[in-house]
Amino acid sequence: MTGFSVYLGQPLDEAYIKRMIKQGYQMIFTSVQIPEEDDETKYHYFTKLLNLLKHEQVTYLIDANPSILTPSFYDHLRQYDAQFMIRIDHSTSIEAIEAIMAQGLKCCLNASIISRELLTSLHQQLNDFTLLSFCHNYYPRPDTGLSVDLVNKKNELIYQFNPKAQIYGFIVGSDLRGPLHKGLPTIEATRHSHPVVAAKLLQETGVSEVLVGDSLIEMRQAKQLIDFCKHRHFTLCIEEVFDTTVTYLFDMCHKVRPDNPENVIRSETSRQICPHSIQPQFTTQRRIGSVTVDNLNNGRYQGEMQIVRQTLSAHDNVNVVAQIIKEDLPLLSCIEPNDTFDFQKTRECKK
């Protein structure tokens, strides 16, 4: 499940929220315990959010202190046909967890500070430990985000107690939330990363569910992120195609070969549909992000499309037919065997 964040101390960006749900995002993270937010204001906008999406299938992950989980709070949630998960940041106890579960709600614990002692105690005392999920912190202040190693160790610890646990982690968005405006990542190394690169690193540590921490992510990146998380699919933006005789290759979906090499991304499907001889032209140096097609000099490889990941010298048998834009170059390191990809022209990417 991939999610985004909505903060309640300011008017809702309803158009953005609806676009994200339409894109396929199914979870919303929000908090009712941010100190600088007025209580009356945040509960007003929380109600507006619930009403806005009352006909959508959405799971809400609500960051809350057990002290504010009153009967009236639970009664308010029951008015809506939605899934609610309460994240306890601190003050974790068996009693607090059981009180949440007794209301028919799921409970989420702070994965960043979880300990073996707490997990052991919960595993022994809870009726159904598998109902717990876990969510890491985000870190607004630069240089305070977690290391890859620490996140990996915390996740490994959780999986020892429940191999199928849901573990959430945060990545940075586009409109960086105040007051620091430095991004809200779980892992410090991803503070300035493309969202897909950040999501991939989280997944490699064992995080199963990715959340955008900041209050907004640009729509094209939002689409790239959901496509990656749900389908392992990549849409790459290119400058105009240099060779119009191979435009058919840019109107189709490609699958990466299962034995894909290190320096290039090979399309498994491109050679199968080569409709004509491809003459040698544009046989220039292959830069990172160059899209190439083998010409007739390469015999049975004629028509094979590749995307270059490391700078390669010019070759008489290889035509350079397009170039991926700078903003999408980080995605090349994320593409793996059996993934799929397609292309958009620059003018289409800006729509």
From Swiss-Prot:
Pathway(s) annotated for this protein in UniProt: Cell wall biogenesis; peptidoglycan recycling
GO cellular component, as recorded: cytoplasm
Cellular localisation: Cytoplasm
Keyword entries, A-Z: Cytoplasm, Glycosidase, Hydrolase
Disruption phenotype: Cells lacking this gene show a cytoplasmic accumulation of MurNAc 6-phosphate-GlcNAc, predominantly during stationary phase. This accumulation can be abolished by expressing MupG.
UniProt cross-references to InterPro entries, sorted A to Z: Aldolase_TIM, Cyclophilin-like_dom_sf, Glycoside_hydrolase_SF, MupG, MupG_C, MupG_N
EC number, UniProt record: 3.2.1.-
Domain of life of the native organism: Bacteria
Primary location recorded for the protein, binned into one broad class: cytoplasm
Gene3D superfamilies: Aldolase class I, Cyclophilin-like
Protein family membership: Belongs to the glycosyl hydrolase 170 family.
Function summary: Involved in the recycling pathway of the cell wall turnover product MurNAc-GlcNAc in S.aureus. Catalyzes the hydrolysis of MurNAc 6-phosphate-GlcNAc, the disaccharide product of MurP-uptake and phosphorylation, yielding MurNAc 6-phosphate and GlcNAc.
Full protein name: 6-phospho-N-acetylmuramidase
Species name: Staphylococcus aureus (strain USA300)
Gene this protein is translated from: mupG
